[in-house]
Curated annotation (Swiss-Prot):
Species of provenance: Caenorhabditis elegans
Zinc finger boundaries on the chain: NR C4-type: 18-38, 54-78
Protein name listed in UniProt: Nuclear hormone receptor family member nhr-10
Disruption phenotype: RNAi-mediated knockdown abolishes expression of acdh-1 when diet is supplemented with 5 nM vitamin B12 and high levels (40 mM) of propionate. RNAi-mediated knockdown reduces expression of nhr-68.
Function: Probable transcription factor that acts in a feed-forward loop with nhr-68 to activate genes involved in the vitamin B12-independent breakdown of the short-chain fatty acid propionate. This pathway is triggered in response to a diet low in vitamin B12, when canonical vitamin B12-dependent propionate breakdown cannot function; the resulting accumulation of propionate is probably sensed by nhr-10 and/or nhr-68.
């Protein structure tokens, strides 16, 4: 430690964090250290005698990046950490900003007088908002590359270390052209070759998309592989659902007209049949109901991808991923406030982020199904797919 004086003494004191969401605490509110956002949320809930319900058995995560997602779980967390409802009185502790009583390192304020309201626009906010716009435009490029004829034959290592194709304007102008194969002229029931074809294409695009994310590019190679492996099952599912033409809530259509619905497929492993029912019921229906736009989809996809808790991600990369994810989450919420207004934005924001719980559950179940299918040779995975799903074997 360098230097002396007051700053030395201050730096030796551990920062107190909000026991509810782990943001920086602004002091003790209702008996526990908490931030202004959680203090305000708890007070409003008690004063208005509000009750909430949870769509996911009360098991939603509550942290500073997604604390607005599920109000039921957030309120339960307030009670669990010891917030005292009896400490709230009508004329005491009015809702508003509480001056910090200790000097903390400068942080970006993400809460204002209302729960999860966007802070005043700062340079940081503008940077985050600009990146959200970039994510949306990149998503359009992903769609173009997905529908093109171009499909390289390469190993996973070659795919990850090569230059990003989506940012190569010359390449995109020459190759990102709609393939005649990907024009829907009629519908036909998908077979195993169709599933294989579209998963391989979506994995190819996923890697090129990941390379447009500065956070991903800053990671060591092993952490990049861990993130790609973590999303190898869920990324195609999201893309299939979002880009499917509307043929009802029981049908998902690939760009070439192949489709699947609730029709049982006895030739496919049991776990894969379960996955398609999950996609229809837990992804397609809510996403169609919300009418998610390109920007919201692009942000949600990135938030789920940049998971600091993904298997095999090194501890040194977790903060980088968490910060990158939080920046996108902040920008997404501000975007929703502008689009829907503050009153509806919180509910929409929460409903979208809670789809991450669906994806996480799907990933765990499908990982086991994939291992079983490979062990019993129920599905013939390509070399590239095996490298992505099971890891790169070293001699």
């Amino acid at each position: 430690m360098t230097g002396g004086g007051p700053s030395s003494n201050n730096s030796s004191q551990p920062e107190e964090v909000c026991l509810v969401c782990s943001d920086i605490s602004t002091g003790y509110h209702y008996g526990v250290p908490s931030c202004n956002g959680c203090k305000t949320f708890f007070r409003r809930t008690i004063m208005k005698n509000q009750t909430f319900s949870c769509q996911f058995q009360g098991k939603c995560p509550v942290d500073k990046s997604i604390r607005c997602a599920c109000r039921h779980c957030r309120f339960e967390k307030c009670l669990q950490v010891g917030m005292d409802r009896n400490a709230i009185q009508q004329n005491r502790d009015p809702i508003g900003y509480t001056k910090r009583t200790r000097r903390y390192p400068p942080i970006k304020k993400v809460e204002a007088s209302d729960e999860c309201s966007p802070a005043m626009v700062s340079e940081n906010d503008r940077s985050e908002d600009n990146f959200l716009t970039l994510l949306s435009s990149t998503e359009q490029k992903c769609c173009a590359l997905r529908l093109a004829e171009y499909m390289p034959s390469r190993t996973l290592i070659e795919a990850v270390v090569s230059d990003c194709l989506l940012t190569d304007e010359v390449f995109m102008a020459e190759h990102a052209i709609l393939s005649p194969r990907h024009r829907v002229t009629s519908l036909r029931f998908a077979n195993q070759s169709d599933y294989h074809y579209w998963h391989e294409r979506d994995w190819f695009v996923m890697i090129e998309w990941a390379k447009t994310l500065p956070v991903f590019q800053s990671l060591p190679f092993t952490d990049k592989l861990a993130l790609l492996r973590h999303s190898a099952i869920t990324y195609p599912s999201l893309v299939h659902v979002f880009n499917s033409p509307d043929h009802g809530l029981d049908t998902i259509v690939f760009p070439d007209g192949a489709y699947f619905d609730r029709t049982p497929e006895p030739t496919r492993p049991l776990g894969f049949n379960k996955k398609k029912y999950q996609m229809l019921d837990q992804l397609l229906k809510p996403m169609r109901s919300m009418e998610i736009d390109m920007t919201e989809f692009a942000a949600f996809k990135a938030i789920f991808f940049l998971n600091p808790d993904a298997d095999d991600v090194d501890s040194n990369a977790k903060k980088t991923l968490s910060d990158g994810r939080s920046a996108i989450t902040n920008a997404l919420y501000r975007y929703m406030v502008k689009k829907k207004g503050a009153e509806d934005a919180g509910d929409r924001f929460g409903r979208l982020l809670l789809l991450g719980t669906v994806l996480a559950t799907m990933a765990v179940e499908m990982k086991e199904a994939v291992l079983v299918a490979d062990f019993f040779d129920q599905i013939q995975f390509s070399t590239f797919a095996k490298q992505l799903l099971f890891g790169i074997k070293t001699e």
